[in-house]
Amino acid sequence: MKKINHWINGKNVAGNEYFHTNNPATGEVLAELASGGEAEINQAVEAAKAAFPKWANLPMKERARLMRRLGDLIDQNVPDIAAMETADTGLPIHQTKNVLIPRASHNFEFFAEVCQQMNGKTYPVDDKMLNYTLVQPVGVCALVSPWNVPFMTATWKVAPCLALGNTAVLKMSELSPLTADRLGELALEAGIPAGVLNVVQGYGATAGDALVRHHDVRAVSFTGGTATGRRIMQTAGLKKYSMELGGKSPVLVFEDADIERALDAALFTIFSINGERCTAGSRIFIQQSIYPEFVKRFAERANRLRVGDPTDPNTQIGALISAQHWEKVSGYIRLGIEEGATLLAGGPDKPTDLPAHLRGGNFLRPTVLADVDNRMRVAQEEIFGPVACLLPFKDEAEGLRLANDVEYGLASYIWTQDVSKVLRLARNIEAGMVFVNTQNVRDLRQPFGGVKASGTGREGGEYSFEVFAEMKNVCISMGDHPIPKWGV
């Protein structure tokens, strides 16, 4: 059986204790995983701290070369990494192989360029003073990454962190550790010096908690649940934070929308990545005049989605990450029905047509709950699974009010041909990201993050400087400006 250890200071470090990680589709044990704690975190942070001065002072061009080299190695290993990710998470292979793992490579290529554009600004004050700013690395960063798209999200954090001259300790979710281990190995193969990137495996309550609280950690980039994010900010002390937390993103479909494209995007936005995505459009508001027809067609198409073996290229919905998470999502479906929603597709039970080797897997059919009231728990709480809540609305004012009537504010989606309406809604909707007449299409230059309970801070492009860089001002006298003569 494969044994997953830690990567600390360039070495593969065995753990004192191990636990199993399982394939969500079959239930089989994939690997034994080292269970790190405070001792391993201390070693990793010490290694990162020792490596920081030399790495931070490495010429940007050289750091960029190493980032590109790591991106190239990922490109060369896409099939293997994708297969590993699918086995570890239950995500369909066509999504890991064609989208998520290649995106990870792009992260390193992109930030290799960004790190060479770390230009400050100058502020002359008449002919007396010259101020200029320096963009400098923070130091040791804690990167805490989730289980839903682990490799892509890990590289989304590692790439800007290292490219900007920081060193890091990466802590992946204990539910999806395999590709993070591979990332640590590839980083060393790319020539990134020992100690610059350390990977510690283990549980969030032990390894994760020790990492974010460590006094030598200067910045924390966390992606995960809102409750955990709040706890980190309460206990970890005075650090820089980027918190990408939960979401309950609204989709507003107006009667003048391109209905075919809106249907395509709404289905994709909630059901891709098994519905386990923070930007999922899980509350779909449809204007009353088109509500019956839209709901009917949405449910028909949801019923036709292919659920099954994640390794089959034709599968669209794979297995949820764990049995515990399956119980949570299934429980929300039952709750929605109890609250009065109409079940039009899917349901809380496992599919009955699975082959024998998948019957122990965490499979759930894409579920459509119609006639949902926005006050229901299924409309207010993050389910994080393939469950779409469909709600009618009367007009623009009501649509906006309902969209904002939730504690989260990560992504939002607007479907209309009315440009004036788009401009009003984009300004007034409470979300960090607004997508108009499109699904979630990312550009690595754009800021990613949310408002309200969806987090704080932004990452992406130059916005990653917020957490991974410090701005220093230097003020130089250019002449004989007056200085007060005290004590003369």
Q: Which residues are covered by each model-predicted region?
A:
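Conserved C-terminal structural/oligomerization subdomain of aldehyde/semialdehyde dehydrogenase
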Residues: 26-32, 217, 252, 306, ...
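N-terminal alpha-helical segment of soluble enzymes
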Residues: 24-89, 289
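Long amphipathic alpha-helix in the N-terminal Rossmann-like dinucleotide-binding domain
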Residues: 46, 68-79, 93-118
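ALDH superfamily catalytic-core signature
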Residues: 227-373, 436, 483-484
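Short, well-ordered beta-strand elements within core beta-sheets of diverse protein domains
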Residues: 29-36, 51-57, 143, 251-254, ...
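Hydrophobic face of amphipathic alpha-helices that form TPR/SEL1-like repeat modules
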Residues: 1-26
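Rossmann-like NAD(P) dinucleotide-binding subdomain of oxidoreductase/dehydrogenase enzymes
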Residues: 120-261, 393
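A short hydrophobic/small-residue beta-strand
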Residues: 167-169, 343, 433
